[in-house]
Amino acid sequence: MKLHAFLLSPPEEESHDVAVVVHAEHSCAEETGIYARHYLEEGYQVLMPDLRGHGRSEGNYIAFGYDDRLDVMDWIYWIIKRDPKARIVLHGLSSGGAACLLAEGEHLPSNVIAVISDSSYTSLKEECARLIRLATRSDFLPTALRLFFFRVVVLFRAGFDLYKASPIHAVKHATVPTLFLHGDNDQIVPVEMCKRLYREAVCSREYATFIGAGHLEGVMTNPNRYWKRVDSFIARQKET
């Protein structure tokens, strides 16, 4: 499978700092420009991958972060091969954030100094069950049965078990410092999921919510606070 990414470099200097911006489901690398621009202005190289089944990458299904975790790992090692001194920050959005957290469960190399997870779910099973309940409140079929059918369809069509897509399990094995970000008015992934991820993580971690922000809207509702939290968090990791 061929995977595509954009690699952007700051115009004035060669940097060992690399930000990997991982987009959300049903999106693509080109829609993460607001994040790439900030990192470029801070002197980072920026890698913007198209996840499998998105943008210019190949793939016949959307993995909602699960198989994407392995692609994130591949991009990390591609960066390290180009620059063994690279200092890598992962910045994931929604299911892209889930992919980054799931990658933490795969034991990230020491070149990765920080993970920024914006609006990740706790587990795909829990998120799917919640959405099924919202969509079928007046239906006679129980949520558990609908979820079982959906699990079987995903297993046969995409080849993975959605029950294994569990960032909340992965963060129990995380070692890379992680910043959890979430809008407190998120109607797609409830902010309570972010709070639970923060509580369960065993790595050094911080947590910030954005008042009135919906799904992935923290960077738009309060960009100054958003980037202040991100930049200060990363700066502390560089000092260690």
Regions found by a protein language model. Name each.
Residues 102-161, 169:
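Hydrolase active-site cap/lid region
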Residues 184-189, 216-217:
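Acidic catalytic loop of the alpha/beta-hydrolase fold
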